[in-house]
Amino acid sequence: MRIDILTLFPEMFQGPFNHSILKRAQENNLLQIDTINIRDFSQNKHHTVDDTPYGGGAGMVMGPEPLFECFDHLKAKNAGQVGRVIMMCPQGEPFTQEYAKELAREENLVIVCGHYEGIDERVREVLVTDEISIGDYVLTGGELPAMVVVDAVARMIPGVLGETASAEEDSFYNGLLEHPHFTKPREYRGYEVPEILLSGHHGNIRKWRRRQSLLRTLERRPELLKDVELSKEDKKVLLELQNLLLSLNLKQMK
């Protein structure tokens, strides 16, 4: 996969993309990330990319010229192929694990990082295919959200994590929150690892992890359960857990 990131601050991406999983993915030719400075395509001597908004108002708006020129450059470089074009913005569609899996199936992505008050609407109407938000809050620019999207998408590319099971056990991959993890030592300051994880019985361990995943989701993000495909055993376990939590709540109220 190739991801082109259009930004006013390409240096912001050097650290996050040159460490850990993303670094290995690029070294193994599973992922290519190119950052492109929008200012390089400004048509004036001062390399400015913004101007005051028509109709008045506070702040500055990123103009269409440098972004359209930037896309012309990308098309020329990639034989007319740019792939899906994502604009990071607060009013976009919420970014989810399912969205990340969908984007990971693409060969090419372009991510546009806005700044200032916003981007000229003509860019959105003509060039952009997807608008994505990582949450109901406003950030200074689209760079940090772009990093989130790249990291989440990269994890879904086959081979990036080494083992597919590692990605499939992540929270949200199958709609549920992830089960707890433990490592050595077996006992630390009186806190012990659950005995079942030391049993070597893989079937029982798998059931325990599934139960813990259902419990965490029920306690912390119950709204997720309505969209999860549950087996008969899952439904049985959920009913037990709901009754257990109800019983505990009633005891606390007395």
From Swiss-Prot:
Q: Give the GO biological process terms.
A: tRNA N1-guanine methylation
Q: GO cellular-component terms in the record?
A: cytosol
Which CDD domains does this one have?
TrmD-like
Keyword DNA repair in record: no
Location(s), subcellular: Cytoplasm
Q: Which domain of life is it from?
A: Bacteria
Q: Which residues bind S-adenosyl-L-methionine?
A: G114, I134, G135, D136, Y137, V138, L139
Q: What GO molecular function terms would the record report? A: tRNA (guanine(37)-N1)-methyltransferase activity
**InterPro entries registered for this protein in UniProt:** Alpha/beta_knot_MTases, tRNA_m1G_MeTrfase_C_sf, tRNA_m1G_MeTrfase_TrmD, tRNA_m1G_MTases_N, tRNA_MeTrfase_TRMD/TRM10
Catalysed reaction, written as an equation: guanosine(37) in tRNA + S-adenosyl-L-methionine = N(1)-methylguanosine(37) in tRNA + S-adenosyl-L-homocysteine + H(+)
- Renumbered to this chain, the signal peptide range is none
What is this enzyme's EC?
2.1.1.228
Q: Please tell me which top-level EC class this enzyme sits in.
A: transferase
Q: What does this protein do?
A: Specifically methylates guanosine-37 in various tRNAs.
Description of how the protein assembles with itself and partners: Homodimer.
PANTHER family (UniProt xref)? TRNA (GUANINE-N(1)-)-METHYLTRANSFERASE
Q: Which family does it belong to?
A: Belongs to the RNA methyltransferase TrmD family.
| The name this protein goes by in its record | tRNA (guanine-N(1)-)-methyltransferase
Gene designation: trmD
